[in-house]
Design a protein with these regions (language model features):
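Long, internal low-complexity/basic segments
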Residues: 60-135
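Carboxylate-dense, calcium-coordinating segments in secreted/extracellular and ER-lumen proteins
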Residues: 54-58
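Intrinsically disordered, low-complexity polar regions and short flexible loop motifs
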Residues: 51
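C-terminal cap/loop subdomain of S1 sulfatases and analogous C-terminal strand-loop tails that border
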Residues: 1-44, 48, 122
Length: 135
């Protein structure tokens, strides 16, 4: 890597969800590791230049861009892990500790809220995705 830096930007978030994304060219790719009970898909891809509010997920249509994003994330991840004293990715640590900070202990109350607001249809999928949190 030169002193110029990379031609892409990697972002991680572990407060409300556990996601890592990469911004390159017109694309914003987001990989969801824990959806914070929001039923996000595992992968999302947005054309930020045409869709700055990230409303139109193109992941299923642009597998080429998703593949490039995954390659860039892997390159970044390998570089970061080599530079750390710890051999565990901090995002993995958050997940093994119970998930995103503000989602911990939240699923039962959230299900009550979903029922009260007419969105109870989402509860079976939440329980399927997060069985340990509902034990």
């Amino acid at each position: 890597m030169s002193n110029r830096g990379r031609d892409y930007l990697v972002l991680s978030q572990c407060a409300h969800v556990c996601q890592r994304g990469v911004r390159f060219g017109p694309w914003m790719y987001v990989r969801t590791h824990h959806d914070g009970y929001h039923l996000f898909p595992d992968e999302m891809l947005f054309d930020i230049e045409r869709d700055p509010h990230e409303q139109d997920d193109l992941a299923s249509d642009r597998l080429d861009a998703c593949g490039e994003a995954v390659r860039r994330l892997a390159e970044w991840h390998d570089s970061m892990m080599k530079s750390m004293d710890c051999d565990v990715d901090p995002l993995r640590t958050v997940i093994t500790e119970g998930g995103p900070t503000y989602a911990r202990g939240f699923p039962r109350r959230y299900c009550e809220r979903l029922e009260a607001t007419g969105r109870g249809w989402a509860i079976p999928e939440l329980k399927r995705r997060h069985p340990r949190e509902f034990e």
